[in-house]
Amino acid sequence: MDELTPRQAHILKTLIEEYIESAEPIGSETLEKKYNLGVSPATIRNEMSQLTKIGYLKQLHASAGRIPTARAFRFYIGQLMEERQLPVTEEAKARQTVEDANQSVDSLMREATHSLAETTHALSLGTVAGEDTVWHAGYSKILDMPEFYNIDVAAHVLSLIEEVKRVRELFFERAVDDPVSILFGEELGWPYFEPVGMVTAKFMIGGPDGRMACIGIIGPARLPYSQVIPIVRYYGGLIADVTRNV
């Protein structure tokens, strides 16, 4: 399990899930009081210190608790997290929305991004090769999240709505070719994107010989990945399936 001990992995998983919920730096006292980790507060502190040294946690201020790094989130997603599948009723609702909108690429992507934003409570973006449009929905949702109280962070993220070239770079070039790709602003090197996380899905519109397209969500790095990864994956597969015979 990477270079982490089982105890370190357990502490890291607990800390990440608490951080996803609270949006606050996590201290050893919080973990000790709220969760039965079976070790002393001193041991938790020591393990958190070690996790910081090896790049899984970071401390924003000397007196504050710690938050996960992109490396920690990737380890969590790949080895610790259990996905929560989209309920059948939500799948059916999404399919109906996409099938009803399958009149044109514009209506399809417009309705799909809106539906994805509503389902994930995040900013949703979509793009299709050959189209000079970024479809988007849900920008008001991220403004309620603490990470976007910083006007510079919010402005730079929302500016993507108008930047087709940058969205294509993000979705087609930076994202891997897996069914779902996870991107962290911390890794992009773009100004003010450090607290940002993204989940995207690539697919073909119009079957294997059609056009490459991508849909995804943007939110804080602490996105509830166990929920949103299967949702984004489902939407990508759904659009590909619905348009296969177009």
Which functions belong to the PLM regions below?
Residues M1-K13:
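Short alpha-helical segments that sit at the start of domains
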Residues E3-L4, V39, P68, L86:
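Alpha-helical hairpin
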Residues I11, T69, I217:
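Conserved RecA-like P-loop NTPase ATPase core
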Residues M81-E83, P87-V246:
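Intrinsically disordered, acidic Ser/Thr/Pro-rich low-complexity regulatory segments
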Residues L4, E24, P146:
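Residue-level marker of regulatory loop/turn positions in helix-turn-helix DNA-binding domains and
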Residues T14-E21, P25-L80:
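N-terminal helix-turn-helix
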